[in-house]
Amino acid sequence: DATNTTIDFRHSNKQKLTLTGNITNVYFQFPEISGNFLCIFLQNGTGGWDVSNWKTKDSAGNAGNGNSGVVLWSGGTATTLTETADKADIVSIYWDADNELAYAVASENF
């Protein structure tokens, strides 16, 4: 739904989400082990969609303990997605399972 969307990395380290509306909370759910993960966020043919909050879940579905479950972004500020119709942004994340911390960087405007 547009309020909460979970990107589940427990079975694959690469995911894709086509945005059809604004999302309040994106939750990245990670496996029990540390690793590198990637999600492509695609704007639909309308575009103009964004994500308000970027959060984490551990493998059991609980909020990540590190940083109160909030994704840590390069430069200290969460990305703003490219809102042009049919454009894509790639979010790359390193998940530190021991400390339940997600470090993210976005490559934008493809």
State each model region's role.
Residues D1-S12:
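Extracellular beta-solenoid/beta-roll
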Residues L17-F110:
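Acidic, glycine/polar-enriched metal-coordinating patches/loops
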